């Protein structure tokens, strides 16, 4: 009887562990061909930020299928619409003293988003921190890249390299992002942000290879 109780206890513990582990790892071994609307919905439910789940739930069945197809197919992923926005903000209130001759510290941010059927799947932001004096950009302090959103379970994004420079009175910061789809290389996306002394900003995104 003791052996039977031990075996039953071991089985019960194993079953409980499976219930705890599966929801968080269901997409980790997911192959592109196996990704479905149902499994993707479960993936979104496991995310800490529920905004993507809410947006996805509002889509029609056809739109959901289009999103999932886009996530599975690398060729469709490259065709996703990219929306961008750029902003410049002062790092401190002292930066608002535009009439002074002291150097001012500013940050330009440029965000690129990939969408499928109106649903945002990835969002990458590049920040360039720089100094200005009067109407001139004097130097770049640093460049940073942040994956602010990635709800494609088949895609991993990492920073491959970075570069910063000053040209034509603009501060530039560039990040090369390495994309992988289902653990296979899917090319490099180069994202550049720039800022000026007057507060103008912008950027660009291009596929390197």
Question: Which residue ranges define each predicted feature?
Answer:
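N-terminal prepro-regions of secreted/extracellular proteins
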Residues: 1-116
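Mature secreted bioactive peptide module from preproproteins
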Residues: 89-209
């Amino acid at each position: 009887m003791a052996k039977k109780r031990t075996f039953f206890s071991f089985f019960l513990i194993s079953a409980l562990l499976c219930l705890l582990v599966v929801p968080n790892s269901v997409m980790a071994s997911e192959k592109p061909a196996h990704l479905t609307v149902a499994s993707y919905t479960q993936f979104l439910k496991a995310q800490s930020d529920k905004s993507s789940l809410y947006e996805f739930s509002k889509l029609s069945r056809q739109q959901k299928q289009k999103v999932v197809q886009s996530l599975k197919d690398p060729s469709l992923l490259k065709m996703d619409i990219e929306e961008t926005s750029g902003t410049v903000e002062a790092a401190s209130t002292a930066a608002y003293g535009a009439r002074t001759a002291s150097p001012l510290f500013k940050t330009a941010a440029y965000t690129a988003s990939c969408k499928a059927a109106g649903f945002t799947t990835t969002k990458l932001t590049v920040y360039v921190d720089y100094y200005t004096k009067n109407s001139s950009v004097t130097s770049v302090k640093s460049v940073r890249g942040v994956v602010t959103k990635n709800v494609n379970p088949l895609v991993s994004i990492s920073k491959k390299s970075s570069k910063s420079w000053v040209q034509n009175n603009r501060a530039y910061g560039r990040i090369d992002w390495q994309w992988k789809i289902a653990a296979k290389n899917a090319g490099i996306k180069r994202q550049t942000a720039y800022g000026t002394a007057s507060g103008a900003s912008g950027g660009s995104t291009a596929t390197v290879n």
